Amino acid sequence: MAAPAAVLGPSALGQSGPGSMAPWCSVSSGPSRYVLGMQELFRGHSKTREFPAHSAKVHSVAWSCDGRRLASGSFDKTASVFLLEKDRLVKENNYRGHGDSVDQLCWHPSNPDLFVTASGDKTIRIWDVRTTKCIATVNTKGENINICWSPDGQTIAVGNKDDVVTFIDAKTHRSKAEEQFKFEVNEISWNNDNNMFFLTNGNGCINILSYPELKPVQSINAHPSNCICIKFDPMGKYFATGSADALVSLWDVDELVCVRCFSRLDWPVRTLSFSHDGKMLASASEDHFIDIAEVETGDKLWEVQCESPTFTVAWHPKRPLLAFACDDKDGKYDSSREAGTVKLFGLPNDS
C-alpha cells in the first residue's frame, strides 16, 4: 500500500487536535465508482448554455430550495429570477429598487418564494416571487457585501465593507445583534445545526462563534493567506474553505480538522459549492475553468471550461446542474455578449 501523501498548503500543517490540519491525506487507488458514474453522465451532459440576465457583471447566483428558480444579482443594481424548465432557464422577472450594486443574494432555506439581496446602497431587501415585490427594505450601517439566511429561517446575517455583521430578524425585519470585528471579514455562514456562526477572514483564519450568544468558540489557522469563502456540505459532514493561496481545504465539522486539500487551481479561490448529495465540490477562481472534485478523495471529477474568471457557482439542490457567472470578457471578444449572462453546465449535449 502506498504511503500517505503529505497535505501541503494550510499553515497548521502537522499539528493535531481541533482546529488543525490532519498531517496526512489518504491516497486514492484509482477513480471510485461514483467518479466513473458521474464522468459517464457528464460525457453526455457537458453542454454549457448562456442566458442573458443583466446589463452588467453578475456577482451572485443561487437556487431556491426546491430548485425551481435561479436568482442572480448584478452590478446593474438589480436581481433577476429564472424558472428552470427542463434544459433551460426562462427569465421570470427582474427586481429593481436597489440604488447600488447587488453583491450577494440568497434564498430562504425552506420557503422557495423568498430571497434576500445585499447591496452597496446600505440596505438589504427581501423579495417574494409570488408578488414580484419587495416585502421589506432594511437599512444597515454600511455597504453590504455578503449575506446568509440561517438554516431555521429566522435570521438573516449581513456583512458590510467595514467588517460589521448585523443579525436581522427575518419576520420583524429588525436588527437583533451587531458585531464589529477587528479583522477583514470575507464570507459568513451558519453551520447546518444553526448553533454556530462561521466567518472567514483576511488573516487566513476561520472564526467560529456560538449562536445565538455570539461568543468566540475557536479561531482556526486555516490558510497562510486571505481566507475568502466558506460553504457547508448539505449532509452536515464537512465544510470547505477557499483561499488566496489557491487552495481549497475540506474540514470535518465535528473534529474541526482539515481532512483534505484540493490544489488544481492557480489563482485565489473565489467561490465554492457542494452538490446536493454532498459528493462533489465545485471551486472557481480567475483560472479559466471550474474544478469539480469528488469530496471523499479529492480526485478531479470534471473541469468546466470558461473564457474568463468565475466569481460565483451554485449546484442545483436536486440535480447535477451547475449555475455560474463569469467576469466580463476583456475585449478579446465582443465584450457586450458575455456581460450579464448566467451560465448552466450539465445540460444534455443534444439539447
Curated annotation (Swiss-Prot):
WD repeats lie at residues 53-94, 97-137, 139-178, 180-221, 222-261, 264-303. Pfam families: Beta-prop_THOC3. Keywords: Acetylation, mRNA processing, mRNA splicing, mRNA transport, Nucleus, Repeat, RNA-binding, Transport, WD repeat. The keyword tRNA processing does not apply. GO terms for cellular component: chromosome, telomeric region; nuclear speck; THO complex part of transcription export complex. GO terms for molecular function: RNA binding. The keyword Transport applies. PROSITE patterns: WD_REPEATS_2, WD_REPEATS_REGION. It is found in: Nucleus; Nucleus speckle. GO terms for biological process: mRNA export from nucleus; mRNA processing; RNA splicing. Its main location: nucleus. InterPro entries: G-protein_beta_WD-40_rep, Tex1/THOC3, WD40/YVTN_repeat-like_dom_sf, WD40_repeat_dom_sf, WD40_rpt. The modification N-acetylalanine is found at A2. Component of the THO subcomplex, which is composed of THOC1, THOC2, THOC3, THOC5, THOC6 and THOC7. The THO subcomplex interacts with DDX39B to form the THO-DDX39B complex which multimerizes into a 28-subunit tetrameric assembly. Component of the transcription/export (TREX) complex at least composed of ALYREF/THOC4, DDX39B, SARNP/CIP29, CHTOP and the THO subcomplex; in the complex interacts with THOC2. TREX seems to have a dynamic structure involving ATP-dependent remodeling. Belongs to the THOC3 family. Component of the THO subcomplex of the TREX complex which is thought to couple mRNA transcription, processing and nuclear export, and which specifically associates with spliced mRNA and not with unspliced pre-mRNA. Required for efficient export of polyadenylated RNA and spliced mRNA. The THOC1-THOC2-THOC3 core complex alone is sufficient to bind export factor NXF1-NXT1 and promote ATPase activity of DDX39B. This is THO complex subunit 3.
